[in-house]
């Protein structure tokens, strides 16, 4: 598998498929999971017909970077990203999954998304324009789109299998999973965001907002909260170049901006069939993902 050839899907013979998400193919290996990040890309909640070469490698290697750096804040589910350390049945798939896979512990996923926002953008900006609040949190009047908030806020959302996640208040989250658990998730979410945003700022990147997912892992008769899925990637976060930041509108970003711009330009109705992306949009999007990884980590993508 050449470095430039995108991986749209994986079919690992002899390995039980757990589920297939918009980007990741998941496999069961005894009591563990193998997460393989493909190069699929979605927009408006649909997987597009084109893939972005190396996107899955960026997501996996950036998540691995953050899992390694945030262990002092919260335990995570990562075991290894080195296929030579994986169970024997996976060895014959090494060339396909190298650099884009992660062996993880199975957890019981907590059924809310944990979003931290340091800047007013996206769905938060839309809600603020309506009622001056975001997920029930009152904000100062007169804020502009992309303004920095007085302090980061925790804005949970429900997990949607299809379609958009729905923003909810802390109280609503408490009714779903319990107030004590929500309180601890809020603490962890804001601690992770604060740590990540500070590191990113030192690398010239603003983390406007980001989404974390957590699971529960049985340990010594107790349920331990564990950080799962992906962490501070261009797919789960809004990354802005600090030297181009100008509040009062949308910002340039290290993500699928070129894809969204193209889809808007061709007036796609956001329903199937999904369009193919032209080569220049694919190339520029790939470059943005790799630039985000290399800026954030100071390392070349493996």
Task: Locate each region found by the language model.
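Intrinsically disordered, low-complexity acidic/polar segments
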Residues: 44, 125-126, 219, 236-238
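A long amphipathic alpha-helix within ATP-dependent nucleotide-binding catalytic cores
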Residues: 177-208
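Conserved metal-phosphate-binding beta-hairpin within the catalytic cores
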Residues: 116, 207-230
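Anionic ligand-binding catalytic core segments
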Residues: 130-181, 224, 231-296
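Short, active-site-adjacent segments that bind or coordinate small-molecule cofactors and metal centers
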Residues: 105-107, 202-210, 215, 286
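Short, well-ordered strand-loop elements centered on a beta-strand within folded domains, enriched
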Residues: 32-39, 126-128, 163, 221-231
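Active-site loop/lid in soluble adenylation, ligation, and acyl-transfer enzymes
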Residues: 2-157, 270-276, 280-302
């Amino acid at each position: 598998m050449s470095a430039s050839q995108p991986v749209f899907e994986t079919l690992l013979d002899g390995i039980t498929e757990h589920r297939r998400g918009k980007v990741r193919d998941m496999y069961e290996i005894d009591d563990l999971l193998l997460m393989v990040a493909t190069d699929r890309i979605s927009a408006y909640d649909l997987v597009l017909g084109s893939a972005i070469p190396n996107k899955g490698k960026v997501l996996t290697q950036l998540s691995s970077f953050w899992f390694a750096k945030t262990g002092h804040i919260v335990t995570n589910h990562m075991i290894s990203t080195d296929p030579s350390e994986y169970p024997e049945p996976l060895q014959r798939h090494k060339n396909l999954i190298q650099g884009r896979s992660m062996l993880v512990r199975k957890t019981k996923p907590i059924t809310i998304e944990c979003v931290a926002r340091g800047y007013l953008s996206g769905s938060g900006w839309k809600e603020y324009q309506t009622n001056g609040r975001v997920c029930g949190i009152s904000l100062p009047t007169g804020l502009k789109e992309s303004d920095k908030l007085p302090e980061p806020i925790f804005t949970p959302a429900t997990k949607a299998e299809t379609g958009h996640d729905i923003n909810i208040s802390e109280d609503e989250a408490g009714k779903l999973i319990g107030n004590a658990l929500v309180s601890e998730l809020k603490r962890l979410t804001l601690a992770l965001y604060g740590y990540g945003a500070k590191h990113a700022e030192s690398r010239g990147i603003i983390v406007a907002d980001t989404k974390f997912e957590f699971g529960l892992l049985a340990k010594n008769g107790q349920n331990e909260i564990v950080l799962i899925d992906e962490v501070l990637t261009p797919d789960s976060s809004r990354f802005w170049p600090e030297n181009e930041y100008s509040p009062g509108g949308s910002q340039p970003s290290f993500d699928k901006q070129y894809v969204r711009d193209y889809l808007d330009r061709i007036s796609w109705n956001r329903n199937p069939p999904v369009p193919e992306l032209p080569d220049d949009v694919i190339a520029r999007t790939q470059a943005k993902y790799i630039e985000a990884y290399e800026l954030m980590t100071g390392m070349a993508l493996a």
